[in-house]
Amino acid sequence: MNELELLGPRAYGDALGRAALKATAEDFQVDEVLDIPLSGDGEHLWLWVEKRGLNTEEAARRLARAAGVQLRTVSYAGLKDRQALTRQWFSIQLPGKADPDLSAAQDDTLQILKSTRHKRKLQRGAHAANGFTLRLTQLDADTDALNQRLEIIARQGIPNYFGTQRFGYQGGNLGEARDYAARKALPEQRAVRSRLLSTARSYLFNRVLAARVADGSWEKAQVGDLLAFTDSRSFFPAGVDECSDPRLAILDLHPTGPQWGEGHSPAGGATAELENAIANDESALREWLVRAGMEHERRILRLPIGRLTWHYPESDILQLEFVLPPGCFATVLVRELIDLVPVGQTDSPCVF
């Protein structure tokens, strides 16, 4: 499957040109933003780690080996890109133990920048945001047009698609999920099960969002929508009054789409009709998610791009800096600007 089939239409028209991303690790930098005051004592050793060309799971395995502990005692908030320069937190549970010598874990691809103790382990999804610095090289596009589109995006946000990274190479993860769903089976390995269930939910969400981008309603509240704030997992129904809430205009409040699980869509009106129609069209995937014990959740349809800035270090380089909530994809912003020329591996998760 191609990008259009896995995601959906762009919000702001055709790509404005072409560029390369991830020609080097420095072209895709991610800094995890953690809003947790660390106590300095406790049985959990917290590590601020810089990784280059190394995914989060391999870094965790390396830290576990160096510390002489089982992998399950190593925790992290989110998955970060392999083909990138990333900085993120890990924690290791060490009850009654001194800080281990972790030098064996470090080399050119992994450096421990600082460490401290805390009373609790690092939970998945505990980070507040991810900060990105992207360098688009070999840029072939009109900079005036790029600037105009970036200004619009800064004001209006972008569709909050799950990026192609979620679906694997050419959508292979989705094919696997469909196969398991058809057999009414679940993968035995926990990591594979989690990956494929996430793929199925993400695809159903993207189909709903694609339909609303196509009809222009992705950034507008309509009666029957379920609304949520940018950083909140809770939601509430939209009536006539809620559809004119001023917080919609300033990108604090957004319509949401389904993360399918048990039950029908809790939305109403045209929103529920669309969501249930897509779920019925993909009934095997939806029923598979229900049998797996997934609960119905919501995800904002519109993604505000926090602290977006850009400049051109050279005539053929565009550098972007911005902040996204956890679970949102930097490559979806790039997609609203340009087409990417193939450079290295790009199909790996950028955020959890």
Swiss-Prot record:
Annotated EC: 5.4.99.27
Pfam family, one: TruD
Gene Ontology annotations of biological process type: tRNA pseudouridine synthesis
Reaction it catalyzes: uridine(13) in tRNA = pseudouridine(13) in tRNA
Top-rank EC class of the record's enzyme: isomerase
Recorded GO CC terms: cytosol
Catalytic residues in the record: D81
Classification via InterPro entries: PsdUridine_synth_cat_dom_sf (IPR020103), PsdUridine_synth_TruD (IPR001656), PsdUridine_synth_TruD_CS (IPR020119), PsdUridine_synth_TruD_insert (IPR011760), TruD_catalytic (IPR042214), TruD_insert_sf (IPR043165), TruD_pseudoU_synthase (IPR050170)
A GO MF term: tRNA pseudouridine(13) synthase activity
Sorted UniProt keywords: Isomerase, tRNA processing
Domain TRUD: 157-303
Keyword Isomerase found: yes
Leader peptide range in chain numbering: none
Assigned protein family: Belongs to the pseudouridine synthase TruD family.
HAMAP family, per the entry: TruD (MF_01082)
NCBIfam families reported for this sequence: PRK00984.1-2 (NF002153)
Its job: Responsible for synthesis of pseudouridine from uracil-13 in transfer RNAs.
Protein name according to UniProt: tRNA pseudouridine synthase D
Species, as recorded: Pseudomonas savastanoi pv. phaseolicola (strain 1448A / Race 6) (Pseudomonas syringae pv. phaseolicola (strain 1448A / Race 6))
The organism's taxonomic lineage, starting at the top: Bacteria, Pseudomonadati, Pseudomonadota, Gammaproteobacteria, Pseudomonadales
Gene: truD
